[in-house]
Amino acid sequence: MNNIQLAHGSGGQAMQQLINSLFMEAFANPWLAEQEDQARLDLAQLVAEGDRLAFSTDSYVIDPLFFPGGNIGKLAICGTANDVAVSGAIPRYLSCGFILEEGLPMETLKAVVTSMAETARAAGIAIVTGDTKVVQRGAADKLFINTAGMGAIPANIHWGAQTLTAGDVLLVSGTLGDHGARSEEHTS
């Protein structure tokens, strides 16, 4: 099939084929290989890395799906990883939920998923569980992604908005608000 069909979200054979041929292959890791409805994470590893858990979720519903420097998939990984990292945690695990519009080209989904896998792998993050739903044509705008991420916060780090004081120095890796401005620039 060249396009997403309602059957890809029905829990049947088409959905299993999509999961196995795309998601399992791209996001391959031991947690996904268990093929359970949840990821079973090793608490000892997280405890060894810190004394608190940073946990965040975000949804991505942008248009266009592809833009200079990235796409909705890369944005989903980077955005959620950043939300976890600003606490001082090292992002380790992500869940990923897709809402796909019937008729979405399979090549579009594959490009987004491949980008997500590459971005997560480069950051040392495992996508350990996920979900896929397909809605009727017109009920969504091509592709929506929800991610949730977690990582352990080292015991000696206590970052947060409430700890900021006048004179603190903030490090940023680019122009503030740049990604929002860039997305708007390409939709007008």
Predicted segments with their positions:
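Helix-biased detector of long, well-ordered alpha-helical tracts
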Residues: 1-184, 188
